[in-house]
Regions:
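Sec-dependent N-terminal signal peptides
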Residues: 5-14
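Glycoside hydrolase catalytic-domain context in secreted enzymes
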Residues: 17-180
């Protein structure tokens, strides 16, 4: 009996070695991120700071493109719902409507990302990182990007910006993770 147990000892010792600690989903995200950062070399960290991140295969990090835009819908990755420009959304004075719109935007973005990921495609405009909202206050009509803002009212702009983020990120009680 002792001999059989001794033969199984290496199996038990090595069975816990298969997964890196930072991949342990039962640990808090902050702890996992810290553990992963300790594993990355300086060169790998720098490579992950680009809009198009190459994979770090030795750690199981897949390629990712951080460049996506959802100013008024998911941009440039096939068909999507196109909502009014932010200046038009602000004219509604309805933060709740903006929230509902960006809830739809995040659902579309998640679906598109799932499709492209299943095709092993990681191109620009296929990720889950959205460059929105623009919360600059529109003060000078000569600024050509004024329509990308929620106007000149700081209070309204702040309410609209908050609802955009809440719509995109969701409430964490859904069936899947939204855009975090």
């Amino acid at each position: 009996m002792k001999q059989k147990l001794l033969c199984l000892l290496p199996f038990f010792l090595l069975s816990g070695c298969g997964q890196a600690t930072y991949k342990n989903a039962s640990l808090p995200a902050e702890e996992r991120a810290g553990l992963l950062l300790k594993e990355l070399t300086l060169e790998e960290k720098v490579s992950l700071m680009m809009d198009s991140s190459k994979p770090v295969e030795r750690l199981g990090i897949k390629p990712y493109n951080w460049w996506n835009e959802a100013l008024h819908g998911v941009a440039r990755a096939g068909l999507a719902t196109v909502f009014p420009q932010p200046i038009g959304m602000a004219a509604s004075f309805s933060p709740e409507t903006v929230y509902e719109g960006f809830t739809a935007v995040s659902d579309e973005a998640r679906a598109k990302n799932a499709y492209y990921t299943s095709q092993e495609s990681h191109e620009r405009y296929q990720g889950l990182t959205m460059w929105t909202p623009t919360v600059n206050i529109y003060r000078d009509p000569r600024w050509g990007r004024g329509i990308e803002t929620y106007g000149e009212d700081p209070y309204l702009t702040s309410r609209m910006g908050v609802m955009v983020v809440k719509g995109l990120q969701g409430t964490n009680d859904g069936k899947y993770d939204k855009l975090h």
